[in-house]
Amino acid sequence: MIALGIEGTAHTLGIGIVTEDKVLANVFNTLTTEKGGIHPKEAAEHHAKLLRPLLKKALQEAKVNIKDVDVIAFSQGPGLGPALRVVATAARALALRYNKPIVGVNHCIAHVEVTKMFGIKDPVGLYVSGGNTQILALEGGRYRVFGETLDIGIGNAIDTFAREIGLGFPGGPKIEKLAQRGEKYIELPYTVKGMDLSFSGILTEAVRKYKTGKYKLEDIAYSFQETAFAALIEVTERAVAHTGKEEVVLVGGVAANNRLREMLKTMSEERSIKFFVPPYDLCRDNGAMIAYNGLRMFKAGIRFNIEETIVKQKFRTDEMEVTW
């Protein structure tokens, strides 16, 4: 069977085409800015402009005709309303035009589910991106959130810090390079509340320290990463201990960070559990993960009426019953 998935929850538009065990195409285009963040309206305009050429490119790469596709999947949420609506409208149009079934996919769940293409069975997922930071795992037929950010996502915190010091967007790779040259640890707020996290405090203090001119930028970047990532590892380790699961996966755009990978790998080795990171094109926001999750849902008998494809900006991870 073949599924086509459309992702567009934030600044990346992605279209993926997959079978049960293979990615046939996974193409994307990301809206970037030199200064400032991403405006929802700009993201929607970006997606609308590029949907048709990106769809054509995906079909060409996969060497399939749209008529060969068995199901259309799309990211139903959570995300930016205007961007989500562009994607949902496109998915509905394809489904109606070619008489194909359609399914809406939870973006956060898809990030973890795509690891099952690589033999992962039942992991604890550390999902780290711009808008989301969650520690989640399947329990009682739903993906339960064992810990999450109480304010901003770790990726958003890093990008905002980069923007405040004039590095532009996206800031993750730039901050990571600076951090690699850091030599001195500077104390920054470490905020873990129960199983939840907060990154607004560390962001504010890092910017304040930078503006004093008393600290090397490389040292601030290094300390920012070490402190924030240690908090992520702590909560992930607690979730592993609570659930008794023997696999940990790292997903989301921030999974590209080598220091975070290294820290999570060390924790996994100390607990003698499996650690896995998908190829980066399947870590970041992408259409293939939406297609894969949609195909699993479709094979389990899940079908959506067009009326049920309304987008959900605040689509909770534990809102969806997992029957596939």
Curated annotation (Swiss-Prot):
Transmembrane segments: none annotated. The gene is kae1. Monomer. Component of the KEOPS complex that consists of Kae1, Bud32, Cgi121 and Pcc1; the whole complex dimerizes. Its main location: cytoplasm. Binds 1 Fe(2+) ion per subunit. It catalyses: L-threonylcarbamoyladenylate + adenosine(37) in tRNA = N(6)-L-threonylcarbamoyladenosine(37) in tRNA + AMP + H(+). This is tRNA N6-adenosine threonylcarbamoyltransferase. InterPro entries: ATPase_NBD, Gcp-like_dom, KAE1/TsaD, Kae1_archaea_euk, Peptidase_M22_CS. Its cofactor is Fe(2+). It is found in: Cytoplasm. Substrate binds at Y127, V128, S129, G130, G131, D159, G172, E176, N257. Keywords: Acyltransferase, Cytoplasm, Iron, Metal-binding, Transferase, tRNA processing. GO terms for cellular component: cytoplasm; EKC/KEOPS complex. Fe cation binds at H107, H111, Y127, D285. GO terms for biological process: tRNA threonylcarbamoyladenosine modification. It comes from Thermococcus sibiricus (strain DSM 12597 / MM 739). Its EC number is 2.3.1.234. GO terms for molecular function: iron ion binding; N(6)-L-threonylcarbamoyladenine synthase activity.
